[in-house]
Amino acid sequence: MLRDPTTTGWPPLLLLLLQLPPPPLVCGAPAGPGTGAQASELVVPTRLPGSASELAFHLSAFGQGFVLRLAPDASFLAPEFKIERLGGSSAAAGGEPGLRGCFFSGTVNGERESLAAMSCVAGWSGSFLLAGEEFTIQPQGAGDSLDQPHRLQRWGPGQRREDPGLAAAEVFPLPQGLEWEVEMGNGQGQERSDNEEDRKQDKEGLLKETEDSRKVPPPFGSKTRSKRFVSEARFVETLLVADASMAAFYGTDLQNHILTVMSMAARIYKHPSIRNSVNLVVVKVLIVEKERWGPEVSDNGGLTLRNFCSWQRRFNKPSDRHPEHYDTAILFTRQNFCGKGEQCDTLGMADVGTICDPDKSCSVIKDEGLQAAYTLAHELGHVLSMPHDDSKPCVRLFGPMGKYHMMAPFFIHVNKTLPWSPCSAVYLTELLDDGHGDCLLDAPTSVLPLPTGLPGHSTLYELDQQCKQIFGPDFRHCPNTSVEDICVQLCARHRDSDEPICHTKNGSLLWADGTPCGPGHLCLDGSCVLKEDVENPKAVVDGDWGPWRPWGQCSRTCGGGIQFSNRECDNPMPQNGGRFCLGERVKYQSCNTEECPPNGKSFREQQCEKYNAYNHTDLDGNFLQWVPKYSGVSPRDRCKLFCRARGRSEFKVFEAKVIDGTLCGPDTLSICVRGQCVKAGCDHVVNSPKKLDKCGVCGGKGTACRKISGSFTPFSYGYNDIVTIPAGATNIDVKQRSHPGVRNDGSYLALKTANGQYLLNGNLAISAIEQDILVKGTILKYSGSMATLERLQSFQALPEPLTVQLLTVSGEVFPPKVRYTFFVPNDMDFSVQNSKERATTNIIQSLPSAEWVLGDWSECPSTCRGSWQRRTVECRDPSGQASDTCDEALKPEDAKPCGSQPCPL
C-alpha cells in the first residue's frame, strides 16, 4: 500500500502534501523553453491497394519513404480475450471483436528484420523499426481517419543527456514516500508481521506453526509438476476489472487506459533483474458500469480485497485449460481506501503467495493514472510471494537494498535499470522451483507483445490529463512549473483558483514517458531528452546462459550431502525486452556419501537438538528437549523441520527447510533438496537405484536374514508379553485389528525396553493419537489406539531389544488377535519360544483419572482478523473412552484467532 509522504524537513517551496485536497504549494517558477533540433515531421499516410486482409500505406519523412504492410494481429490479448460490461445498457456480457481488429503488425519496405505495430484504438497510432531506427506515429486530429495529418518521430537509444537549455532534473530525497501495504503485513509496511514471515519461509529463526497451517494450495488445475531448478516461460493469465468509479471517470477511454497500464506493468516484468521469464496476459476485461453489479468497494481496504476475491470467483472457469481461465484477478478503482490505523492513502492491497489459489489470487489497485502500473506490478509481486525489500528475511539475506526497487514498502520512484531487488528475484524463483507456480505453465496460443509507443504521445495522457487522473477532474497542469520539476515532478493547479499556486504530492511523480517538455524534447525516465539524441532504436537482445560455476560446499560431512552448481543468464543478459534464458539454471549432485559413525542419533534429530536451549521451557521453567516429528505431517511438508517436545504433544516448525541431504522420513530413502523430496538410494546417492532389502542390506538380495512371524491372543488382564524383538531386527510390523464396529476394544499395544522402561502405553496411560517413538536414532511409528488397525512399524534396524506387549483392560466376546513379523540375520541365535509367551500377568492398579486429549490445530483460513484455528479437546480415560471426569477449569483452549489485524500489502 502507498501513502503520501509527510512534510517533515522540507524547505517551504518543496513541501509535499499528505492528502487531497492539499493545502497550497508552490511548485516553482516558470520554466524556459528547451532547445534542440526537431526529430519529427508531420506526414499524411497514403493508403496503398492490397488484399482485404492487409493494411498497406506509404509515408514520406526524413528524406526517405516508408511502405508499411500490416496484417491483423491481436496477440496483445489472449486468444479468447473478451471485454464484458456489467450493469449498463449493454449489461449482458459479450465480446468486442472490433477491438481485436484494431491491432496490426507487419514489416516496413519489405525488410525481414523490420517490425511494425499499429493500433486503430483512438485513432491510428503505433511504431516501427527499420535499419536500426525506431519511429512512432501519432494522429494530430481527433478523428479515426488514416489520411489525416500524423506526427512521425524518430527514436534511438543513445545516451540520455540532459537538455542543455534546462537545469538538470533533480530528485530530492524523501523523508518517506508512498507506502505499499500487503495482506498479512503490518500497518506501517516497513517490516512484515511474524505471520507473514512464516508464510514466506523465513531462512532462520523460529517458525511457530500448526500441523496443517501454512500449506500452499496445489496448483489449480495442474496436471504435471514442472522440473525443479529449470527456468521455464510463465504466463500470468489475468482478469482486469474496472469498477463504476473508473467507468465514470474515464468514459470511452477506460479500456484503452487499463490496457496501457497493464502493458507498462508487463514491461516491468520483462526486466532481467527478475531472473525469470514472466509474461502478463490479459484474458478478459470486465467493466462495471453500475455499482450494484460489481464488488462492494469501500474505504476499508482489507474488506474491499475480501469482497473482490469472493466476487471474482464467479467469472473464473474451473479448468486451467479453458481459454477464459485466469490465474489472478485485478480490480481498478478510483475509490480511496484505508489500510490500518485510519490511514486512508493506500494504493494497493493483495494477499501474499496466492498465485495458484483461485480464491485468493487477487489484488485491488487505486487508480491514479499511469502510476497505477507501478502499483499493479507491486501488488502482483506480493501475489507471486515477494516480500517487501526491507522485511527481515530480505535484510538478513541481502542487507539493506535501498528504496528504489519495485517491492520497496514506500513508493518514491523505481530504479528502471534495476527495478527488481535480488530478494524479489529469489523469492519468486523459490515459489516457482517449489512447484507453487505451476498454474502459470500453460501458455496461450499467442503471447502478449509490449506496445512500443510511449504513453505521453497519446492525447489520453497529455499533461492536463495526467494531472486530472492523479489530482482530480478539476485540476490541470501548472503553467509555472520550475525548471527543476520538468519531467521529475507533476504539479497541478485547481482550475477555479485565482492564486498562482500549484500542488504536488507523492514526492516524485514523473511525467509520463513521451510527454513534450520543450521544443524538440520529450520526457523519458524523469529526464528531458533531446529527440535527436535518441536516433537509433535499442536492439532487442535475448539472454543466453553463462558457464556453470564450480561446485559449492557439501551440505553434510557424511551420510550423503548435496552440493550445487548454478549458471546465470548473463552471456549476454537480456536487454530491451529480450527473452530471458530458458532451461536448467541449477544442478546438484551427491557428496560425502560414506556412512556416518554411529552415535545413536539421526541427522534430523541433531537438527532438532539445536533448539534444546533456545529459550523454550515448560511451565516450570525446565528446558524442553526436542525430537523429530513425523506423524501427522503432510507429505508436502516432510522437508520442514518439525520438532516435538519429548514426552509432550507440543511441536513447532523450527525451519522451513531441513538441511539438504536429510531423509524425508523414517520410512523412505528419499532425501530433501531445497525443501523438496527427491529420490535417492540406500548408498546416499541421488537417483541411485540401490535399495535396502528386507534384511536391511543396501543392494542386497534378501538372503542374509530370515522372517520371524507369529500371532498372539491375550488370555489375562493387564500387560501380556507378546514377543521380544532383538537388536538388529528389521522391517518390524505389529498389528492389532479391532472387530468390525468395535473401535475401542479395551486392548492396546505397548512397548518397553530391556530395563523395564515403557516407551508406549505404559503405566495404564494410553496414547490415542499417532506418534513417533524414538529409539537411539531409529523411529518406530505408532498409529494411535483410536485407529481401527492399531499398528507399530519400523523399517530401520532396531538398535536395542524391545518387548511388545498387549494391555487388556476389558473382556470381549471376541478377543483381539495380534500379528507380528520382522526379520533377523541368519546367524542370529533367536527363538520365538524363548522370547514370547512369558505371559507375566500384571495386577491392574486403580486407573488414574481421565485427562484432556488434544487434537492438532486446524489450518488458518487466513491470518487476518475474523478467522479462527480450532482443535479437538476431549476428555478421555486411560482406555481411550470418552469421560466426563476431567477438571473443566484445566481444559485447554480449543480455538484461537489467526490474527487481529487486516492484512495490507
Swiss-Prot record:
The TSP type-1 domain, residue ranges: 542-597, 848-904
Q: Disulphide bridges in this chain?
A: C309-C362, C338-C344, C356-C439, C394-C423, C478-C502, C487-C523, C517-C528, C554-C591, C558-C596, C569-C581
Q: Which SUPFAM superfamilies match?
A: Metalloproteases ('zincins'), catalytic domain, TSP-1 type 1 repeat
Residues of the region (Spacer) are 706-847
Question: What does the note under cofactor report?
Answer: Binds 1 zinc ion per subunit.
Q: What EC number(s) has UniProt assigned to this enzyme?
A: 3.4.24.-
Q: Name one GO molecular function term.
A: heparin binding
Known tissue expression: Expressed specifically in adult lung and heart and low expression during mouse development.
Quote the Pfam families the UniProt record gives: ADAMTS_CR_2, ADAMTS_CR_3, ADAMTS_spacer1, Pep_M12B_propep, Reprolysin, TSP1_ADAMTS, TSP_1
* Protein's UniProt keywords contain Calcium: no
Q: Where is the signal peptide?
A: 1-28
User: For Zn(2+), which residues are the binding ones?
Assistant: H378, H382, H388
Question: What keywords is this UniProt entry annotated with?
Answer: Cleavage on pair of basic residues, Disulfide bond, Extracellular matrix, Glycoprotein, Heparin-binding, Hydrolase, Metal-binding, Metalloprotease, Protease, Repeat, Secreted, Signal, Zinc, Zymogen
Highest taxon of the lineage:
Eukaryota
**Residues cleaved off as propeptide:** 29-228
| Biological processes, Gene Ontology terms | extracellular matrix organization; proteolysis
- Peptidase M12B domain segment(s): 234-444
Q: What is its main location?
A: secreted
Q: Give the top-level enzyme category.
A: hydrolase
Q: Where is the composition biased (Basic and acidic residues)?
A: 191-215
Q: Which GO terms describe its cellular component?
A: extracellular region
Please quote what the entry notes about the protein's domains: The spacer domain and the TSP type-1 domains are important for a tight interaction with the extracellular matrix.
Q: Its function?
A: Has anti-angiogenic properties.
**Protein name from the UniProt record:** A disintegrin and metalloproteinase with thrombospondin motifs 8
Q: Give the organism, scientific name.
A: Mus musculus
Lineage at the top is: Eukaryota, Metazoa, Chordata, Craniata, Vertebrata
The record's gene field reads Adamts8
